[in-house]
Amino acid sequence: MLVFLIHVRDPQFYAVPAAGRAKNGNLRIMGFPPIGIMSLSAVLKRAGHECVMFDQANTETPNQVIIEQIRMRRPQLVGLSFLSTTSYPYARMLVRQIRAVDSKVKVAFGSVFATLNAPLVKLHCPEVDFVCRGDGEQLILDLVEQLDNPAAVAGLTWARDGRVVNNPDRAVERDLDQWPFPDRESLALDFIESIPLDVPAALSMDRYTTLQASRGCPRRCVFCDIPRFNQGKWRSRSHQHVLAEFNHLREHGYGAAYFVDDNFLLQPQRIKAICKGIIDSGPTIHWGCEGRVDSVAEHLYPLMAKANCRTVMFGIESGSQQVLDRLKKEQTLNRLRKNDRFSVDYVVG
């Protein structure tokens, strides 16, 4: 089956002045590479399907380019992934344009926003056939096999006789090692001129990508959607599987990587195993990660630095203890000050 996967972005998000471009027109800033659709592409291809990806962070991939490809190639399924409310209107617009050129193709939404608002999204955007909830790897494999029988696919929201149907939730997948590495080779990233705008420049100016060693966070911050998306669970890949991907990136010429884990700094023994594996593998790439100030074992900072960790990003959220308490951050300013001192000494710079 031919599947198109699209990373939808608000065009204004990447609107940069001329000074923000290289002489060849490449962007000097951009957001993270879309690891979500790259992961789904790898899963589909391993199962024998054909997959084509489009990243609308690339100014060379506007709607009209995608629409023309749909007109020419006639995929059986088009999946759209978008980050938040700012991209949602553009996803709806693109779906309507898709419908204008191909009324038979099946269209699916996925992502955190779509998961947490699935019934409303299906109601407000009747042009979309399916809203996919939760992790997408096994779901999309099931969907391509049951494209004409959506009732058989767990985690799917769809419509029957004009009424929205929420299939039972899909069980949270614990075994993340079963999935292949993201399909980075099939998505053009040569328009990137530097690292993302939301990662400190201390990381690297080398060829850059992202990877994910774990999913979820056990905390319950009131502003965060991650616990709901992951059904309150935290899951991790084995350190051996993470190291295998790290070595794969190095062998393919990457000079920098950023862990997009929701809370990388959990389980000190796991962090230690990853860092020691990176060190033992010899010359390696620069990397960064993020986590909570109260989930860090400070004694591992020197080891992380030795393993070429260039930056650790903390979600401080507020300098007011009262505000932190209202946000249910479950952290104190004293703990923040303590970890900030260690971060400056050992990791950043």
Give short role names for the model-derived ranges.
Residues M1-L243, E251:
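Acidic, low-complexity intrinsically disordered segments
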Residues F32, D177, D183-G349:
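Radical SAM [4Fe-4S] cluster-binding motif and immediate context
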